[in-house]
Amino acid sequence: MTAIAKIYAREILDSRGNPTLEAEVTLENAVCGRAAVPSGASTGTKEAVELRDGDKTRYLGKGVRAAVDNVNGVIAAALVGFDGADQTGLDHRLINLDGTENKGRLGANALLGVSLATAHAVAAARKQPLWMYLSTLGESKVSLPVPMMNIINGGAHADNNVDFQEFMVLPVGFASFSEALRAGTEIFHALKSVLKGQGLSTAVGDEGGFAPDLRSNVEALDAILEAIGRAGYIAGEDVLLGLDVASSEFRDNGKYNLVGENKRLTSEQFVDFLDDWVTQYPIISIEDGLAEDDWAGWKQLTERIGHKVQLVGDDLFVTNPKVFQEGITSGIANAILIKLNQIGTLTETLESIAMAHRAQYAAIVSHRSGETEDTSIADIAVATTATQIKTGSLCRSDRVAKYNQLLRIEQALGVGARYAGRDAFVSLKS
């Protein structure tokens, strides 16, 4: 019943107007699963390869026809007849079919599209929502994650003077996901009012957050704190703050170049800088606080504030189990950001999450800046008991689609729905 009868891919557009790949897998019982692949703006050097055509006369070189052809050709030929219910076996066949360390021959976008679409198809064949089916592949428990809401965009995600890429609010002091979402939404609208009152733009960046031309990173934090209060919530109690520093983007010749603060800092000085911020503001999470190749700096940052703040590796680990294991062994960071297209298959994604749980690292399931209406990451976050999810701000349908899916899942779970809330950070001590 779950043998694969047909695999087909097409080129579609993502939220930035760039081409991406969408795959469909049809089983022998005619049930079809579909998945679309996201794309990042700031990327780690060790990420799996996203295959682009490079033809400048078409989509500015960003077409994905080659990846589509790989799905419709060599991948389909290898997988038709394979049992889609054997997700691990299917993904290993995809990996072996590509045959490279970084999935550069067929493209991680080709592999991930097929991997995810197969899971959707099998879930549909079993008349289960995706989150319920995925929970049978690993974790038996499910929970609703804390949303890390990116409400001010900077860095590579916006055209402004803010160095840091994301300023987030984390509504932890609520009993349910739906109440947490409401709080985040009210803060988002309050922030719009704050920015308008300062004569600043309320245009939004790639992930739906505002991208005002603030003079410094500190101004972004101060504006968010004002918005939290104006919305009727208490910063540090109801709502905590998170940062995606994306520091690899502004490290140059061994120095961290903060244009907004007019500073060029060594690794040690930048650790001091972040430590000061944690003291001054209710910050609970810092992502990519140091550059991906600055492991000595990461070690120092972890030893300094890792007991009281979540230190997330994104570019640092690129969802790669081998790289992640090196970080665990070295005592680097205490959380990992999970981006499916960084590694390229569902099985490897689930393996990274399981590895995080075993090492007592937090796992945060994440979108990319170039998204689609696909909501798979919401189901994955719930099914794996990941304590947090990053899926952007409270506008743009490509972001809100994931929040709406989480609302549906919460309703489906009924009295069994459990919101992670403060428990997401129970291992951190002040």
Curated annotation (Swiss-Prot):
<dbReference type="InterPro" id="IPR020810">
    <property type="entry name" value="Enolase_C"/>
</dbReference>
<dbReference type="GO" id="GO:0000015">
    <property type="term" value="C:phosphopyruvate hydratase complex"/>
</dbReference>
<keyword id="KW-0460">Magnesium</keyword>
<feature type="active site" description="Proton acceptor">
    <location>
        <position position="339"/>
    </location>
</feature>
<dbReference type="InterPro" id="IPR000941">
    <property type="entry name" value="Enolase"/>
</dbReference>
<feature type="binding site">
    <location>
        <position position="165"/>
    </location>
    <ligand>
        <name>(2R)-2-phosphoglycerate</name>
    </ligand>
</feature>
<protein>
    <recommendedName>
        <fullName>Enolase</fullName>
        <ecNumber>4.2.1.11</ecNumber>
    </recommendedName>
</protein>
<dbReference type="InterPro" id="IPR029017">
    <property type="entry name" value="Enolase-like_N"/>
</dbReference>
<feature type="binding site">
    <location>
        <position position="339"/>
    </location>
    <ligand>
        <name>(2R)-2-phosphoglycerate</name>
    </ligand>
</feature>
<dbReference type="GO" id="GO:0005576">
    <property type="term" value="C:extracellular region"/>
</dbReference>
<feature type="binding site">
    <location>
        <position position="390"/>
    </location>
    <ligand>
        <name>(2R)-2-phosphoglycerate</name>
    </ligand>
</feature>
<dbReference type="Pfam" id="PF03952">
    <property type="entry name" value="Enolase_N"/>
</dbReference>
<feature type="binding site">
    <location>
        <position position="314"/>
    </location>
    <ligand>
        <name>Mg(2+)</name>
    </ligand>
</feature>
<dbReference type="InterPro" id="IPR020811">
    <property type="entry name" value="Enolase_N"/>
</dbReference>
<dbReference type="InterPro" id="IPR036849">
    <property type="entry name" value="Enolase-like_C_sf"/>
</dbReference>
<dbReference type="Pfam" id="PF00113">
    <property type="entry name" value="Enolase_C"/>
</dbReference>
<comment type="similarity">
    <text>Belongs to the enolase family.</text>
</comment>
<keyword id="KW-0964">Secreted</keyword>
<dbReference type="GO" id="GO:0000287">
    <property type="term" value="F:magnesium ion binding"/>
</dbReference>
<keyword id="KW-0456">Lyase</keyword>
<dbReference type="GO" id="GO:0009986">
    <property type="term" value="C:cell surface"/>
</dbReference>
<keyword id="KW-0479">Metal-binding</keyword>
<feature type="binding site">
    <location>
        <position position="287"/>
    </location>
    <ligand>
        <name>Mg(2+)</name>
    </ligand>
</feature>
<dbReference type="GO" id="GO:0004634">
    <property type="term" value="F:phosphopyruvate hydratase activity"/>
</dbReference>
<dbReference type="GO" id="GO:0006096">
    <property type="term" value="P:glycolytic process"/>
</dbReference>
<feature type="active site" description="Proton donor">
    <location>
        <position position="207"/>
    </location>
</feature>
<feature type="binding site">
    <location>
        <position position="244"/>
    </location>
    <ligand>
        <name>Mg(2+)</name>
    </ligand>
</feature>
<feature type="binding site">
    <location>
        <position position="369"/>
    </location>
    <ligand>
        <name>(2R)-2-phosphoglycerate</name>
    </ligand>
</feature>
<keyword id="KW-0324">Glycolysis</keyword>
<keyword id="KW-0963">Cytoplasm</keyword>
<dbReference type="InterPro" id="IPR020809">
    <property type="entry name" value="Enolase_CS"/>
</dbReference>
<comment type="pathway">
    <text>Carbohydrate degradation; glycolysis; pyruvate from D-glyceraldehyde 3-phosphate: step 4/5.</text>
</comment>
<comment type="subunit">
    <text>Component of the RNA degradosome, a multiprotein complex involved in RNA processing and mRNA degradation.</text>
</comment>
<feature type="binding site">
    <location>
        <position position="368"/>
    </location>
    <ligand>
        <name>(2R)-2-phosphoglycerate</name>
    </ligand>
</feature>
<comment type="function">
    <text>Catalyzes the reversible conversion of 2-phosphoglycerate (2-PG) into phosphoenolpyruvate (PEP). It is essential for the degradation of carbohydrates via glycolysis.</text>
</comment>
